[in-house]
């Protein structure tokens, strides 16, 4: 099937703890962005429990999206889904929903790379055209820029993602994930009241960073009665954010690009935004941060990236729509950028 004059794409996101459905047009209008989050009673994400949540939430989230967009399923001309990377059980649940919709409606299916989608929704919503991108979330920490048909990775974490580092520390500190207030936001609020910078490991190796030692050191200090939690949260943030800002600045200097884009769940952090804004200004570049509603995992970013891919000749036959748990950013062709 060839693209219609106005492609209407429904996107399904299910890589981790969020099940999201977005609806986007080929003109770049986001008509709906609905989601439901799995919140574990304790600890981090349990993949099979999260997948069960997604399966149970799918019908409701789909209905909310159709209602918000004021369209019915037969109006949709394309189905996109997050094909990877992510947690296997969660990815498979979303892929099953997407395959069922595409088959029932007899319309094309497009598998989307989750990391590419975070970049593309950031570009759409901020107007950035050719940025150095810092993508930071619970599962990814990547500095990238476009070159020769693909997004090229300039630097990344050697161990754990920035969002995971912050979340694990927050749980160890006794903070709770509540609906509407994720752990990272709770930690950010405490950090805003911190005044004392406590020395912690700072590990940058070339263009890559390591966060596990920082987390271990900060967690061990939770038992110290003479160190306030606010100061510890502040110090953890300052060290971690300085690391990713340093490697982002190096990529900016190397590429000589004139835009910086911050995207992913951690992009909501105002302190990180401020640090990146400083280095962008020093290099005569414009800083852009993805809007809050599109920072965390969402279906709209999958829908929009699906539109971009489909209108440039990309489709995914159902027999080849298997999920890709470790689908790296630089392995994805990006034909919509010339």
What do the predicted segments below correspond to?
Residues 111-112, 277-301:
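Conserved phosphate-binding/catalytic loops in two-lobed NTP-binding clefts
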Residues 1-6, 107, 111-132, 305:
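Conserved phosphate-binding catalytic cores of ATP/NTP-utilizing and phosphoryl-transfer enzymes
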Residues 72, 185-260, 269-283, 310-313, ...:
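A contiguous, well-structured pocket-lining segment that forms one wall/lid of small-molecule binding clefts
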Residues 2-7, 14-15, 22, 31-32, ...:
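A short helix-loop
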Residues 4-77, 81-85, 114:
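N-terminal beta-alpha supersecondary unit
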């Amino acid at each position: 099937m060839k693209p219609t004059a106005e492609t209407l794409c429904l996107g399904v996101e299910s890589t981790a703890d969020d099940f999201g459905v977005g609806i986007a047009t080929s003109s770049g209008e986001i008509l709906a962005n609905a989601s439901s989050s799995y919140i574990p009673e304790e600890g981090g994400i349990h993949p099979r429990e999260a997948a069960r949540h997604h399966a149970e939430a799918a019908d409701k989230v789909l209905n909310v999206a159709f209602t918000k967009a004021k369209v019915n399923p037969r109006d949709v001309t394309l189905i996109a889904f997050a094909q990877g990377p992510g947690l296997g059980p969660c990815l498979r649940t979303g892929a099953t929903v997407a395959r069922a919709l595409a088959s029932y409606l007899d319309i094309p299916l497009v598998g989307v790379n989750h990391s590419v989608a975070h970049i593309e929704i950031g570009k759409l919503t901020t107007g950035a055209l050719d940025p150095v991108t810092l993508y930071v979330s619970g599962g990814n920490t990547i500095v990238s820029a476009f070159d020769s048909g693909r997004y090229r990775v300039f630097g990344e974490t050697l161990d754990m993602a920035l969002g995971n580092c912050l979340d694990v520390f927050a749980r160890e500190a006794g903070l709770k994930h509540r609906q509407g207030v994720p752990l990272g936001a709770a930690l950010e609020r405490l950090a805003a009241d911190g005044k004392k910078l406590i020395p912690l490991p700072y590990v940058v190796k070339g263009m890559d960073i390591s966060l596990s030692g920082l987390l271990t050191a900060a967690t061990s200090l939770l038992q110290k009665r003479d160190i306030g939690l606010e100061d510890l949260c502040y110090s953890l943030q300052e060290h971690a954010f300085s690391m990713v800002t340093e490697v982002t600045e190096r990529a900016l200097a190397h590429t000589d690009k004139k835009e910086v884009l911050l995207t992913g769940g951690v992009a909501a952090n105002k302190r990180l935004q401020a640090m990146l804004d400083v280095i962008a200004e020093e290099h005569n570049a414009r800083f852009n941060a993805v809007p809050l509603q599109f920072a965390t995992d969402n279906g709209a970013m999958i829908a929009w990236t699906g539109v971009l891919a489909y209108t440039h000749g990309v489709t995914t036959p159902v027999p080849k729509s298997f999920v890709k748990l470790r689908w790296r950013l630089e392995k994805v062709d990006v034909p919509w950028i010339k």
